Amino acid sequence: MKYGLQMYSVRDLTEHDLRGALQQVAEMGYSFVEFAGFMGNSAEDVKSWLEEYSLQVSSTHTPLAELEDEVLDQTIAYHKAIGCKDIIIPYAKLETKEQIDAFVERVNTLIPKLQAEGISLHYHNHDCDFAPTPEGLVPEEELLARTSILLEVDTYWTFVAKQNPVEFIRQHKDRIHMIHLKDGMGDHTGKSLGQGVAPVK
């Protein structure tokens, strides 16, 4: 298993100085990073900084807006330039059957396009993805049943949704290549591992 840092965790640094943030992450001993935006920096600059600090990209959190047809080629080119083979959709509003249907359709269109470029598509869950819609659909279950998208399981949000993260990972291990391991206070208040409500050991 490889460990890395999600750059969103140090967003106060990345927003002002992505290069400096990468340097500090490397000095902390990390070898892998997951980007949550590039703050307007070019792929060439990001690649050079990764090489300078001996870092590798595990993946990126890329909003669905950056995967629309009009910008998809640009997004793919950027990821290939920095050596990233995994794109993760960090969030989608899936509160109704209509929203789920539209998302499923888009995901099923994106997957083969990305696969043709050597890139895998993942979805990062929040607690709301386990909440039934008014029509009785559970978003996470619908994605598993109706698409081949991979999952990046957020253990904290899975726990907040009153699911057992360990059992969920075991049940869907073939669809899970990445895990977000974190802690918090049962809401959006983050805590260091072991300092929140999640049973992290």
Question: What are these regions, as identified by a protein language model?
Answer:
Residues 1-85:
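N-terminal pre-domain/capping segments
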Residues 4, 34, 59-61, 88, ...:
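Conserved beta-strand positions in the central sheet of alpha/beta enzyme cores
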Residues 11-16, 32-45, 63-71, 94-101, ...:
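Acidic-and-aromatic substrate-binding clefts and catalytic sites of carbohydrate-active enzymes
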Residues 19-20, 70-75, 100-108, 135-141, ...:
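Charged helix-capping and loop-helix junction motifs
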Residues 46-63, 110-114, 140-147, 201:
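Alpha-helix-loop-beta-strand connector modules within alpha/beta enzyme cores
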Residues 79-98, 117-127:
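Active-site groove signature of glycoside hydrolases
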Residues 116-197:
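Acidic/histidine-rich catalytic cores of soluble enzymes
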